[in-house]
Amino acid sequence: MCSSHGSPTSSSPPKRPADPAILARLADAHCHPSDDECFEGALESNASSKLGTICAMSSSLENQEITTKLWERNKNKILPCYGLHPWFIHSLSLSNSPTVPTREEHYTALFPSSTDVSQPSPSLATLLPFLPPPLLLSDFLSTLTNNLEAHPTALVGEIGLDKAFRIPNPPELASSAKNSDLQTPLSHQIAVAEAQIRVAIRLERHVSFHSVRAPQDTVRLLERIRGEPDGWGRVHVCLHSFGGSPETAKQVQKMHPNAFFSFSTIISGRSPRFHELLRAINPDRLLVESDFSHTSQLDAQVWEVFEQICEAREWSAEECVERLETNWRNFLELEPEGTGGRRKTKKQRRLEKAPVAEEVDEVEESNPK
């Protein structure tokens, strides 16, 4: 999910017209039709899309249900995904009490003053009336579990970490800047992301993960989970619209054989090293995505990144679509019991030993708001 996922602006014109036969073999691994401003338009666009699969992410508390409705209207094409995006987790309370804290109690604890943690942030008083009522994390996890159990093929997404996001000011505060200075603490983000990953592991569902300006934190989170014998290697994680450096991508691939990478031109394509990054990914771990909510633009966006991959990897269109088609099919499969990651092809039988986690370069990504 990105600042432009609702914008129909394309990053560059296509080099050739989109081929419907190729699109039919591709999956948009990450998009946001549940955020389309026109629900009926989203239904129509999803039905007319030439893509083989549309992986529809949930992001906020409100659009989990919309994702279900989209799937109900187009079960052959929509793959529903349920989860809470880091932009929307500030309403979740980590309290172990069965009683939901008051709005003031919850947000005062979540957004303390930078100079005195016993006091709330000075910005909170103005914003507090506009913030959503608190919800226990345990209650949301119950909803997440119910949605996944009701949809046996559903994935977990979109979840993750975002160190760029600031809580937006509401329209009622017209004289204020677009964003406040309030940022959901990283510790809170990690707790919520990890809790959702635990649900994914327990129910054996794959994960779509958002990481903005948090490469080291993402690596550490995944490494900690990988070190526990709880079935993490059975499921796959897709690092969507990956914007890290080629060096970071190589490190993640060595450490996490169950990691895939999906790319969009609207986000990943901003990097001057985009083609170098595409070449740094193992050919069997590449996926494509649009990261768009304007569903009428999904085909064009996926086609655009498809062309970029062909160019960067010097693949023919047929070779590229064959690889992406196989990769998507492999992504959806579970690994055998007792494995620590993806099964290797005949050319990849040599086991990779995961190195000790090293510091990695910070990813330069724009503020999503």
For each of these PLM feature ranges, what is it?
Residues 1-82, 88-93, 97, 142-145, ...:
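An N-terminally biased module of ancient metal coordination in phosphate/nucleic-acid-related enzymes
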